[in-house]
Amino acid sequence: MLSLCCSLSGLRTLAAQATANWTIEGILGMMDKSAQDFRTLTADIEHIKYTAVVKDTSTETGHIFVRRDEKMRIEIAKPDLRTILRTGDSLFVYNPKINRVEEFDLGKNRSMVDQYVLLGFGTKSDNIRKSYLVSVVGEEELDHKKTVVLELTPKSDQIRNQIIKIQMWIDEASWLPVQQKFFEAGSGDYFLFHYINAMKNLKIGDGKFKQDWPKSVSRVKPHA
């Protein structure tokens, strides 16, 4: 029993030392270096939504394409086909099952959308510090990658009324997020984005960010 306690104590000490090796300044500095040459990202994506009151977990999978010039496309493949397209201040959600596309003008909500989906992809540390209180949670292995986990607490009351904190798993090789977990306010609910087989700076043509749904599509502009 004594030897087991000593072993556990040793593991805790090693974990504490591993965390101590990374400072917030050091991590954000490495993320800044990665952001300097960030142009594009492609990855398989897993989106998980947990609803606490009914203990329900739903999962969507697909692909994401991001370009630094404010363009993003998410193609959901399972369980139901869906396309989310963002170009600048315009956001489109296309549902082929009902042949309908919802159109949103992001306007003042633009920065909030960027923080939800694009957080950590080419984001400068000054912008992260401006918007969040940052702390280091520790190191974890995820997808056979060594990652450091950051916890971000929004400074904005408006955002904190929706999201109380965000955890980001940062790949220590690429210094890009492998996973982001968003904890919703007052409910115990969370949603998570998991990026698999991520490739940085592959060429993504303009065609990937065009509205390529049928001309017969029904267009709807929901109220903000």
Predicted regions and their residues:
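Bacterial N-terminal signal peptides
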Residues: 1-9
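N-terminal leader/targeting segments and the immediate start of mature chains
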Residues: 10-57, 71, 213-224
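Short, solvent-exposed helix-to-loop capping segments enriched in aromatics
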Residues: 35, 112-129
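Extended beta-sheet lipid-handling architectures
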Residues: 43-45, 59-61, 74, 86, ...
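Short beta-strands and strand-coil junctions in structured, solvent-facing domains, enriched
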Residues: 51-53, 73, 80-83, 93, ...
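An acidic-aromatic
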Residues: 63-115, 184-191
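Gly/Pro-enriched, hydrophobic low-complexity segments
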Residues: 102, 121, 127-130, 135-223
